[in-house]
Design a protein with these regions (language model features):
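Hydrophobic transmembrane alpha-helices of multi-pass small-molecule transport proteins
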Residues: 47, 68, 99-100, 108, ...
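Helix-helix packing/entry segments at the starts of transmembrane helices
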Residues: 37-38, 75, 94-100, 163-187, ...
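Specific alpha-helical transmembrane segments that line the substrate/conduction pathway
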Residues: 34-45, 73-74, 79-116, 120, ...
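Transmembrane alpha-helices of multi-pass small-molecule transport proteins
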Residues: 29-77, 100-109, 158-162, 179-197, ...
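Glycine-/small-residue-enriched transmembrane alpha-helix faces in small-molecule transporters
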Residues: 1-37, 72, 80, 84, ...
Length: 291
């Protein structure tokens, strides 16, 4: 990758590594549905003017049905389930489970029998990265609730299917228009729930977490991610998931006092090695979004 590619990649790793901590902080006071509303509404408000300037309103409305389906599968359901799960499991474990997404994507590729050749080198890289993440967190499934882990696997499924919808039905619609329409629809869906479950008081800490989560980690992240896709392609962009996890673990340990395991010392180098191997593929594939 070029220097610009690495810069964008690093920025994405940080920006998409932060949300796990922010969600964990926000759900202490906010209902998960309220958090989804507060995360999507500002993005829609910020992106809609860009859609108008681009002249993409007609394209967005023409494919309203598929944008709605994409939004529900990629944002509406996963973000609610993730926020619910983070009330019961650590941000580190959450980020680890999200790393199943690239592996799910490979499985879906094989099931769909796409023409793209998945090289042994790339499969090895994804495998090494997954093992590294497991060492990073020192995962013990017996120590966590199977219910919340199951919810996170559903999140991973949504994050896998969403990009497939994007690739099959929405490639002709500008990315910003898709995100603007999808977040607007999800915000409207969760609006009644948000009104009913709105808390009587929201602390400044919670507002700060929500603001960063929505404006920086969602709106800002998508703008950077679109540039990253242009620079390095969708295949290499997938690997940002592993770096997200490394950063999420560090933030969980420092900011939330989550357990610091010896596996971090072993796991982080494995994540880096796995990422290098996995980025060696150059052919395109459906973009994987894991914000």
């Amino acid at each position: 990758m070029s220097r610009r590619g690495w810069a964008l990649f690093s920025a994405m790793a940080v920006i998409w590594g932060i949300p796990y901590l922010l969600i964990r902080v926000a759900v202490r006071q906010l209902d998960p549905g309220v958090l989804v509303l507060l995360r999507t509404a500002p993005v829609a408000v910020l992106f809609m003017p860009l859609v108008i300037v681009q002249g993409s309103v007609r394209a967005m409305l023409k494919d309203f049905k598929w944008i709605a389906i994409f939004g529900i599968v990629e944002f509406g359901v996963p973000w609610y389930l993730m926020s619910t799960a983070e009330r019961h499991i650590s941000s580190s474990l959450t980020s680890l489970l999200i790393c199943c997404v690239p592996l799910f994507a490979v499985v879906f590729q094989r099931i769909r029998r796409t023409e793209e050749h998945i090289s042994p080198r790339r499969l090895l890289g994804l495998g090494i990265g997954a093992v590294g993440v497991a060492f990073l967190v020192g995962l013990d499934l017996r120590g966590g609730s199977i219910t919340w882990i199951a919810l996170m696997l559903i999140v991973c499924l949504g994050y896998t299917i969403g990009p497939i919808i994007l690739a099959l039905k929405l490639t002709h619609v500008p990315g910003i228009a898709v995100v603007a329409g999808a977040t607007a629809i999800v915000a409207l869906i969760w609006l009644p729930w948000g009104i009913v479950h709105w808390p009587t008081h929201i602390s400044s800490e919670t507002w700060t977490s929500v603001a960063i989560l929505s404006i920086v980690c969602t709106a800002g992240a998508f703008l950077i991610f679109f540039e990253l896709i242009k620079e390095v392609g969708a295949t290499r962009s997938v690997v940002v998931t592993y770096f997200n996890t490394a950063i999420a673990v560090v933030l969980g340990v420092i900011g939330l006092h989550e357990s610091l395991t010896a596996g971090i010392i072993v796991g982080f180098p494995l994540v880096l090695v796995g990422s290098i191997f996995a980025t060696s593929s150059a052919k395109s594939e459906p973009t994987i979004l894991v914000a």
